[in-house]
Amino acid sequence: MTMMMSDLPNDLVEEILSRVPITSLGAVRSTCKRWNGLSKDRIVCKGDANQQFTGFTRYVNESTVCSMRLDLNEIQNEDVELVELSINKINKFIELELFQVYYSDGLLLLVTDEVDSKIVVWNPYLGQTRLIQCRDTEHFKYRYALGYDNNRNHKILMYNRKNCEIYDFKSDSWKVLDIIPDLHTNIYVRDMSIKGNTYFFYRGEKIGEGLAGCLLSFDFTRERFVSCLPLPFQIAKFDDNVALSSVREEHLVVLFNNWEESEMEIWVTTKIEPNAVSWSNFLTFTHFRIKFLVTSFFIDQEKKLAVVFGRSLSKQMRCNIAYVIGDNGYLRILDFGVTFIPSNLPVSYAPSLVKITQGQELSVIEEKKRSRLLASLVYSTLFVSFIIFFSFISSVFI
């Protein structure tokens, strides 16, 4: 008697699903209805989570979101001359002109640079999307942050130097905060979400007078920016390079690239709260004599290595590259050409079961087509109106 997939005992099914790579999630869900249901009730496909880097970024020429994957074992294998970088476009958003990509708690926030005043929140693991209407038609001129409060209610912070608003997923509404964020942040420094709160690198205006740089955090429970937290290094010049990352969104990781001393340091928090922080050195790499603007990175604590993404600033080689740095000084260069926008280099991704739909899930592509159709009708109406107007004027004066 042949046993069907749907007849397998639960413990065996869970064991199978735990060993499948996350890149095979689609195949798992199409196997049978039972497996599809299980994959949406719990996180499966953990088989090679510790062996691969999975992230999302955006293409430079097409402004569309794509997923990317790096095999960490392959990176460490010196016998492998060419490390495979798996990049796939997300067809679901092929119609969107993306401007920025933000990440928190398994959710991606996609910001367009179009005038329909909408942003998109997407849970790649559950396949859910949510369109959010912004109050400002120039929403693409803001910066954003994702987070959640003590009740696990997710929110979006939308801010610039003059205005600060917050969106509540539960109430599906925006409100203006009575604070003005005096953020002197470098556009290439990505903020990072840790335990629901967002941390920003804050650079002071005058080196040597007060704090040259610190961590400014936004508390999504209190809906306030809170006091600056000290960094584990001293910034000596404005062009010293700082970047942020995280470990499973539980520990903040900060990278300091001191060009003058040709030294790169990476530190990990042993404690992180809105009002307190402590640090431990992860690795220090000396004699790093390459002019390199770090914009994104991730670390593997077990393998004791870091993969640092960024852009070479040398006149001979202006391209997007990654350096693999190990505890023993191991260094390997991965050249990605011009695939990525420097400020949108990969964000590390971990799946989550956060449900973001409210009522019927909206189709991003259908909404995009609807907006284009509406714009086309408006332009057509204006064009016809102009023709009628000029025809009338001509008939009067002839």
UniProtKB/Swiss-Prot annotation:
According to the UniProt entry, the coiled-coil residues are none
Q: Pfam families of this UniProt entry?
A: F-box (PF00646), FBA_1 (PF07734)
Q: Which CDD domains match?
A: F-box_AtFBW1-like
Q: Which residues form the F-box domain?
A: 2-56
This chain's protein is named Putative F-box protein At1g67450
Where does this protein come from, organism-wise? Arabidopsis thaliana (Mouse-ear cress)
